């Protein structure tokens, strides 16, 4: 893991649900990393191979963003993997056919989640092989929600509320990585994709600031395609309350070899981007 500052090492909160690394300086910026966790709970023992499980995460995104604590960003990272339960999915985005009994409330699985097996609880690996041989128990899925999903969202909500109270505004960057080629359509993806639910979760000035930094390092930036954002933006953003949220998807080959997952020199370039973004947000005058 990226070496921590003395302040971060002293103040970091680590448990089975999340790692919270406070910024070294006062800032309204929260960076959340929800899909890079590698702490597999002992009770999570699907029959799928470790590779099938592990290739569903956004690898090393914490390494990319952690240096930004030096410029005041607070980093919240989920310790658990998204294959256990995915914080970036609505709680009703669950395939009823994967359950051993009727769910106690109405489910509304998204078609894209059904096709990819990547809803609230992932059922397919990155190669579309099943992660489970049988049905999931309703009790087990409810426990994943209560023990992991809800506490992560609660922690993020509290952090944003405190920043909003202190600064009059709060900024959320929800950070992920994506494969360089779309697994279904085979279409090459842009280096960086910024999602704001098509303008719903962030003002243009915030989106432009982030895009400008990435472009300054030579990266092409796309907006809302192939990813426009999901539950982490929908649940926490409120422009009326001045809580501004933006999803950042980074193409994995920018910082690692996708076959071996070995990091490359591009890691430092992306770290520099987040340091600059954090510095600009920390020093920006209130809008």
Predicted regions and their residues:
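N-terminal catalytic or cofactor-binding beta/alpha core of small enzyme domains
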Residues: 2-172, 177-287
């Amino acid at each position: 893991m990226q070496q921590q500052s003395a302040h971060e090492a002293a103040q970091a909160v680590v448990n089975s649900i999340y790692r919270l690394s406070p910024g070294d300086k006062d800032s309204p910026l929260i960076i959340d990393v929800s899909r890079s966790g590698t702490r597999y709970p002992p009770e999570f023992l699907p029959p799928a191979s470790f590779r099938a499980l592990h290739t569903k995460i956004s690898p090393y995104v914490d390494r990319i963003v952690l240096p930004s604590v030096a410029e005041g960003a607070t980093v919240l990272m989920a310790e658990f993997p998204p294959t256990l339960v995915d914080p970036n999915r609505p709680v009703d985005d669950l395939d009823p056919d994967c359950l051993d009994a009727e769910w106690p409330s109405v489910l509304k699985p998204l078609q894209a989640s059904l096709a990819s097996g990547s809803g609230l609880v992932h059922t397919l690996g990155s190669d579309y092989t099943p992660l489970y041989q049988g049905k999931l128990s309703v009790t087990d899925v409810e426990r994943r929600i209560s023990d992991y999903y809800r506490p992560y969202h609660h922690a993020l909500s509290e952090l944003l509320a405190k920043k909003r109270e202190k600064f009059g505004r709060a900024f959320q960057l929800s950070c992920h990585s994506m494969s360089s080629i779309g697994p279904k359509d085979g279409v090459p993806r842009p280096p960086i994709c910024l999602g704001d639910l098509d303008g719903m979760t962030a003002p243009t000035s915030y989106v432009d600031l982030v895009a400008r930094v990435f472009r300054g390092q030579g990266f092409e930036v796309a907006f809302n395609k192939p990813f426009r954002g999901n539950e982490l933006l929908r649940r926490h953003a409120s422009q009326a309350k001045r809580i501004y949220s933006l999803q950042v998807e980074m193409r994995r080959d920018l910082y690692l070899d996708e076959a071996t997952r070995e990091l490359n020199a591009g890691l430092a370039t992306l770290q520099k981007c987040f340091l600059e973004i954090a510095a600009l947000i920390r020093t920006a005058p209130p809008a």
